[in-house]
Amino acid sequence: MVLARILSVALVAAATLALGVPQAHGASFLPTPTGPQHVGRVDIRLVDRQRDDRAVMATAWYPTDTEAASRPYISHDPARSVQIAATVADWLHEPLLATTMAAATVPAADGAPVAPLGDLPVVVFSPGMAVPRFLASGLAADLASRGYVVVTVDHTGESPAVEFPDGHIAYGTPPAYTPEYMAEQLTARATDVRLVLDRLPELPVVGTAVDTTRIALAGHSFGGFTAATVGNADPRVDAVAVLDGVLTYDGAPPVEHVERPVLLLGVPAATTHPSWQLVHGDVVEVPGAGHYSFTDVANLLPVSTRLCGTVSGARANAITFDRMADFLDRAIR
């Protein structure tokens, strides 16, 4: 199965040109961060001893004085980048994504020291159901350039493919979407997020720079639901941001009130969903957007109206990045 996906990357390369998707060696595809700081990045492996040594991968994005270079989007090993990209594209039913994800780069200084800006506010980000953490790289890098530490989290077993430092790739199982499955995944995700919160002061490179009294949780889709669920119950969390998500799923306890500053940014179907009627916060509706307009897919596959609607990637980025920064500046800056 994996071999077939890898081979498909070569087969779709010509199609990307025909459809107008940019193809280039080391192409960035992602927008340049808009803040004044360069961006650092470090991958982190966390082990939860309370859950049979469950291993969780995360990436910390942060401001640095080191000039950013063009770095691989997924993996430093090209073959593993191709494998992971092919798997993610297969899960999203968009084979053209395999090419752009595998070729993409991000402007980041890997492992560089944190800029001496004092203690920095923190955002922990949970991706959508069956979506890898790297599809939030554009947003994470932009917030980092504005002075935030952003930790994106992969939920092992649910994420399509997660690479660990030893080169091992943990392939996930496609979601079942049954009530029982959704309840199990919410529990696993919430515990993953709390693990990151517990370990913030110990994280490599950024641990001594984070301000654990200024924390926001954010997420896309089911990741937004995860953020709201944890944020509502954990006193360490000061704010919650939900990108195109709702607050109820079959099988999972609904979030009926959010006792924190909250942002909902999404398509009309999300912003008018009944689960948000009792929640007071900032609501930003983006007509014409698609569910994945709030992720890097908006840049990596702009021709997909199924995933990204009719709003351009540049427009989706501008709205998402600016509204997130405005909300976070008011909530935890």
Task: Mark where each language-model region is.
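Primarily recognizes the serine-hydrolase "nucleophile elbow" in alpha/beta-hydrolase
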Residues: V196-V255
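Active-site machinery of serine-nucleophile hydrolases
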Residues: P63-D65, I74-L92, F134-P175, P287, ...
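C-terminal catalytic-base region of ester-bond hydrolases, centering on the histidine
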Residues: W276-R333
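Secretory targeting and sorting signals
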Residues: M1-A24
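Alpha/beta-hydrolase active-site loop
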Residues: G157-S159, E163-T212
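The feature captures the conserved acid-bearing segment of alpha/beta-hydrolase catalytic domains
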Residues: A115-L117, D238-F294
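Short substrate-entry loop that stabilizes the transition state in hydrolases
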Residues: A104-L120, F125-E163, A270-T272
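Domain-level recognition of soluble alpha/beta enzyme cores
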Residues: A24-V123, T310, M324
